[in-house]
From Swiss-Prot:
Pfam families: RemA-like
Name of the protein in its database record: Putative regulatory protein ssl2874
Highest taxon in the source lineage: Bacteria
Organism of derivation: Synechocystis sp. (strain ATCC 27184 / PCC 6803 / Kazusa)
UniProt xrefs under NCBIfam families: MtxBflmRegRemA, PRK04323.1
Similarity remark: Belongs to the RemA family.
């Protein structure tokens, strides 16, 4: 299993193999997840002071805030995966 890295904006990169979900921060349950992660010291703010547009939930229960749209992060995830599969052929 090879490591897949995803750019989440402003030079920040996460391991794609450990991502559980990429969601919008608008709903009350997601806001609760963010506040719970902050209390547990498991919140990583990668927004550089900008508005949070995507919340990335990792398999280690860490929550990462990103200033990039969830669709954009997901597309980077899929495009990178497709690129690597085509490179193997």
């Amino acid at each position: 299993m090879e490591i897949q890295l995803i750019n989440i904006g402003f030079g920040n990169i996460v391991s794609g193999n450990r991502v559980v979900a990429i969601v919008s921060p608008e709903s009350a349950p997601i806001k609760r997840i963010i506040s719970d992660a902050k209390e547990r010291s498991q919140l990583i703010d990668a927004t550089y002071g900008r508005r949070t547009r995507a919340v990335i939930i990792m398999d280690s229960n860490q929550v990462i805030l990103s200033a990039i749209q969830p669709e954009t992060v997901a597309n980077r995830f899929v495009v990178d995966k497709d690129f690597k599969e085509n490179a193997k052929k």
